[in-house]
């Protein structure tokens, strides 16, 4: 059970100390750069969840003790990767989760980057379309003002890829390439 992705990345499993006790967390600066309307923001525990004075997302856990368990975890803890079928106590079932080798979202980002090198406006349009259609609840994302050049567009695209593929090892290849 220690050699599966879920054992290392899921904070909710009770059968591995790697994901559960090590508790991989997103960098607070990266977390704070995520739009408040972006549903991906709920892949990590918001520090506001512990403050009754602040409004925060109602996180759901597969664990019986749910909210109490999440409140014990550190701020910004990853809950993006979860045990299969919610089986946090049974590694034979919970460890049989999907492994993110390649996702269709990667193709959207590749297309937007490639188009931006041909025609910056087209790359901007594709990224805006993807973000508003698939990530930002209610729309409103627009990277036009952040993308006055291919370089500034690539920086914004890479930010979105870092958020999208956090913990999946995909962006490492972009960092080497760029």
Feature map (PLM): residue ranges:
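Acidic/polar-rich alpha-helix caps and helix-coil junctions
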Residues: 1-7, 11, 28-178
């Amino acid at each position: 059970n220690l050699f599966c992705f879920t054992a290392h990345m899921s904070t909710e499993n009770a059968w591995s100390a790697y994901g559960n006790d090590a508790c991989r967390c997103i960098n607070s600066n990266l977390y704070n750069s995520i739009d408040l309307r972006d549903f991906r923001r709920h892949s990590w525990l918001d520090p506001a969840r512990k403050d009754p004075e602040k409004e925060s997302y109602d996180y759901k856990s597969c664990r019986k003790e749910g909210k109490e368990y999440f409140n014990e975890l550190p701020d910004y803890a990853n809950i993006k990767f979860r045990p299969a079928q919610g089986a946090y106590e049974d590694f034979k079932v919970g460890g049989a989760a999907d492994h993110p080798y390649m996702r269709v979202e990667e193709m959207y980002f590749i297309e937007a980057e490639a188009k931006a090198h041909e025609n910056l406006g087209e790359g901007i349009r594709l990224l805006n379309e993807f973000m508003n259609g698939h990530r930002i609840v209610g729309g409103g994302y627009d990277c036009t003002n952040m993308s006055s050049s291919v370089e500034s567009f690539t920086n914004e695209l890479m930010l979105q890829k870092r958020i999208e593929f956090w913990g999946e090892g995909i962006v490492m290849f972009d960092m080497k390439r760029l």
